[in-house]
Each structure stands twice: as C-alpha cells, then as structure tokens.
Design a protein with these regions (language model features):
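Peripheral, non-AAA+ core regions of ATP-driven protein-machinery
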Residues: 1-24, 28-237
Length: 237
C-alpha cells in the first residue's frame, strides 16, 4: 500500500481501560491513531488524535449525526448547553479542545446523606476530590456528610484544569441552593493552597464568551482584551 501511495484504515476496538485492544504493534505500525468518542445517546461525536507522525495531536474534530449521515458540527458551543432560567448547581466555563474554545455547562448536585459518595461524569474524579478538600479547608463548607455529583453537559470530557473555578462555583451554588447568573462564566485553575492561577488562551476564551452572549467573567488575571465583558479578578477562593 505504501509503495502504491494508498491510504489504509485499520479499525480496532477499545478495552474498558480506554486503550486499543490487542498487541501494541497495531499502534506502532501506523502513522496516525484516532479515537472516535461520544455517548451513543447523544448526536455529537469527537474525533481525537492520540498519535500523529506528521503533525499535532492537540486538534479535535467535532461531528454530529444528521439525516445525511455524520457531518461536521456548526455552532458547537450551543450544542453543549442551554441558556434557560437560572438554577442552583449550574455554572459555565470555557474550555479548549485543541485550538477550539467551547462553552461548557458544569452541573453539580449536593445533598445530605448518611453514606456520602462522590460521582463525576466528564470531570476527573481525583481532581474533584481535591476541590472538595479545598472547600472544606479554606471555606469551611462541611461536605463530609453530603453526596456530591458532577456532570459536564453534552457528554464532553474535560482534560484541562481551567474548569476548576466553575466546578467550585457549581458545588457552592448547589450546597447553598442559590442560583448563579446565566450571564456569568468562571475560568481558572485552583492550586492546593486555594490560589486561582492564570490559564492559557484567556483572550480566545473571552472571545468565545462574547460570541455566546455572556456578560460577566470571573477570571484570575487581566486579559489583553476584555471583549466588552465585565471582568472580576479573583486571586484565591
């Protein structure tokens, strides 16, 4: 195939751990490894690169199933959340998928329980445990006797830390049963001492926020261009 300049697709299946089943030689013999991710109950699919000998693996493709088959998704952010009335336990953030900025809704449910448990869908469980420990230590919020459930809307899996502040906001909102304005976004990474750290591509994220008609931004550092948003700068929680 190589001598004839023919492209060959090798399709395999994935184990429960998320790796390619079978011997590793399958990965080594090819130039590109792509994972097609997505919940079967949702229309969106994400094509993500894990190996590319000829370019970057940081880019993603987002597709949706339509009557014409699988097509490239337009206005992607609007498919990951809905801007209805304000409800407790909901906060918005902007994440980066490759070079794309996406508006994402973080949903939290906190309820008292005799046998508390934590569950996270689309957000790393270990990072959730760290954020809950920060809330107990720094803000003295007694979450030890509460169930905490986190969900990232749209079936997105967050692989960066810029959503930390939004997760914290959603948890506090649910715990106090006080809604957060749908016009606000939260962008920031939290350190172990509660400091809110600067994040990359802030200007691009704020540009996406303006596109989605957000009005307020809670961020850790001053951007080059606020994009007309009212920015609040937070150094720690």
């Amino acid at each position: 195939a190589k001598s004839q300049n023919i492209c060959v697709f090798i399709i395999g299946h994935i184990t429960k751990e998320g790796s390619i089943a079978g011997p590793r030689v399958l990965e080594h013999m090819v130039d590109v490894v792509l994972y097609f991710e997505g919940d079967a109950s949702r229309e969106l699919r994400i094509l993500r690169g894990f190996k590319n000998r000829f370019g970057s693996t940081s880019e993603v493709g987002i597709f949706e199933m339509s009557q014409q088959g699988l097509v490239s998704a337009n206005e992607v952010s609007s498919k990951f959340f809905t801007r209805g009335g304000a409800m407790s336990g909901s906060a918005f953030t902007i994440i980066m998928e490759g070079s794309r900025a996406l508006s994402i809704e973080i949903q939290a449910l906190v309820c008292e329980s005799a046998y508390p448990k934590r569950s996270s869908t689309g957000f790393e469980r270990n990072r959730l445990d760290m954020l809950l420990a920060l809330l107990e230590r720094k803000l003295e919020i007694p979450l030890g006797h509460y169930d905490v459930f986190i969900n990232v809307s749209g079936g997105v899996k967050i692989s960066e830390t810029a959503a930390d502040l939004a997760v914290i906001a959603a948890i506090i909102s649910s715990f106090k049963n006080r809604p957060i304005s749908k016009d606000s976004i939260f962008i920031g990474e939290l350190s172990l001492n509660g400091e809110i750290r600067e994040i990359f591509n802030l200007d691009q994220r704020l540009k996406e926020a303006k596109t989605q008609k957000f009005k307020n931004a809670i961020i850790p550092n001053k951007p080059l261009d606020t994009q007309g948003l009212k920015c609040f700068y937070a150094k720690d929680i």
